[in-house]
Amino acid sequence: MSITAERKSALIKEYATNEGDTGSPEVQVAILTERITNLTEHFKGHKKDNHSRRGLLTLVSTRRSLLDYLKKKDEGRYSKLIASLGIRR
């Protein structure tokens, strides 16, 4: 259930702050959110897949760290990002 290259480039284009920006927190959080959504759908059919569940927890933790960093640096960008991604915080 990996993210396709087309979907990843679309997310980068949508959330990038500059042209060719792949490292900003907004882009990283958007990609992580897409991966988390895919894994969540995977678990609806594979309830006992504990190895992937550990990976999901790692992704959620990484996303939380990036969101905390963004909130500390720029509250406006943080609010805009969680509203556009539909993340509840």
Swiss-Prot record:
Q: Can you name this protein?
A: Small ribosomal subunit protein uS15
- Any GO BP annotation: translation
Q: Which SUPFAM superfamilies match?
A: S15/NS1 RNA-binding domain
InterPro entries according to UniProt: Ribosomal_uS15, Ribosomal_uS15_bac-type, uS15_NS1_RNA-bd_sf
The family database entries (PANTHER family) matched by this protein are listed as: RIBOSOMAL PROTEIN S15, BACTERIAL AND ORGANELLAR (PTHR23321), SMALL RIBOSOMAL SUBUNIT PROTEIN US15M (PTHR23321:SF26)
Q: Which domain of life is it from?
A: Bacteria
| SMART domains the record matches | Ribosomal_S15 (SM01387)
Tell me which species this is from.
Allorhizobium ampelinum (strain ATCC BAA-846 / DSM 112012 / S4) (Agrobacterium vitis (strain S4))
Q: Which residues form the signal peptide?
A: none
Which keywords accompany this UniProt record? Ribonucleoprotein, Ribosomal protein, RNA-binding, rRNA-binding
GO MF term list: rRNA binding; structural constituent of ribosome
Provide the assembly information. Answer: Part of the 30S ribosomal subunit. Forms a bridge to the 50S subunit in the 70S ribosome, contacting the 23S rRNA.
Give the family this protein belongs to, as stated in its UniProt record. Belongs to the universal ribosomal protein uS15 family.
- PROSITE patterns to which the protein is assigned, alphabetical: RIBOSOMAL_S15 (PS00362)
UniProt function note: One of the primary rRNA binding proteins, it binds directly to 16S rRNA where it helps nucleate assembly of the platform of the 30S subunit by binding and bridging several RNA helices of the 16S rRNA. Forms an intersubunit bridge (bridge B4) with the 23S rRNA of the 50S subunit in the ribosome.
The entry's cellular-component GO terms read: cytosolic small ribosomal subunit
Show the NCBIfam families listed in the entry. Answer: S15_bact
